[in-house]
């Protein structure tokens, strides 16, 4: 049962009961990346308390949008994952990500970020319709913590790659530099000057931003929430 109920006969009211609690949407974001242990969720959701996380997970299980799975050895761990009903919320959450871009602002020094969130960004902001036929490989972050993303454009738009064929462009960089290249707000020479490694065809690299549809408000029209402000 929901913690609260809107006395309104409306499917949006029911959706708000499922998603409206603080942290609920972000828990689903984490499970869109893949199944997660409780400890993984606690680490990735910086700022959530153990008790609140437990309550939110229990509520989402009650709604049938997530469940638990026991992984066999050698993992031998219990993980949370999206159910079919939870997976059906993916396009809704990606649309919310596009909506939230208006208030994102620049990356703050104290903001937590997981490199594999970028895969969700690629899904959320992929251009509709045909895009240049190019193959890209991104290594986001450094060392063993780097996240590898492979995707290509084409007649049907952006799609992720599972093959081992070489990419036209390979980028290795920290998240903020990769974001700058994806959006076209950072020139390749400026990214290299800040430590990015970029290999491959310069013409293909120039087509990278055209794989996406990023729309930015002017700073005067879209201000991010103050740090510590309640959503």
Segments (PLM) and residue ranges:
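Basic amphipathic alpha-helical segments that dock to polyanions
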Residues: 53-63
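Acidic, aliphatic-rich amphipathic alpha-helical segments
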Residues: 85-152, 202-231
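Basic, amphipathic "hinge/linker" alpha-helix immediately C-terminal to the N-terminal HTH DNA-binding motif
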Residues: 20, 72-96
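N-terminal intrinsically disordered/low-complexity leader segments
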Residues: 1-8
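C-terminal interaction segments
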Residues: 164-231
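A short, structured beta-strand/loop element
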Residues: 148-170
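N-terminal helix-turn-helix DNA-binding core of bacterial DNA-binding proteins
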Residues: 10-49
């Amino acid at each position: 049962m929901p913690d609260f109920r809107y006395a309104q006969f409306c499917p949006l009211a029911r959706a708000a009961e499922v998603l409206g609690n603080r942290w609920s949407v972000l828990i689903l974001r984490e499970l869109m990346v893949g199944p997660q242990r409780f400890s993984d969720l606690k680490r990735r959701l910086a700022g959530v308390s153990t008790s609140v996380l437990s309550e939110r997970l229990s509520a989402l299980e009650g709604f049938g949008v997530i469940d638990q799975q026991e992984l066999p050895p050698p993992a031998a761990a219990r993980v949370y994952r999206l159910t079919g009903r939870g997976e059906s919320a993916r396009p809704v959450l990606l649309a919310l990500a596009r909506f939230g871009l208006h208030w994102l602002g620049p990356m703050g020094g104290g903001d937590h970020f997981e490199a594999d969130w970028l895969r969700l960004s690629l899904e959320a902001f992929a251009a509709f319709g045909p895009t240049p036929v190019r193959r890209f490989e991104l290594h986001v972050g450094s060392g063993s913590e780097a996240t590898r993303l492979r995707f290509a454009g084409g007649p049907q738009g952006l799609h992720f790659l599972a093959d081992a064929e070489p990419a036209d462009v390979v980028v290795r960089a920290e998240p903020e530099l990769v974001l700058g290249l994806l959006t076209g707000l950072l020139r390749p020479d400026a990214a290299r000057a800040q430590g990015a490694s970029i290999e491959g065809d310069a013409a293909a690299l120039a087509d990278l931003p055209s794989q996406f549809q990023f729309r930015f408000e002017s700073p005067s029209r879209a201000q991010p929430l103050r740090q510590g402000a309640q959503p």
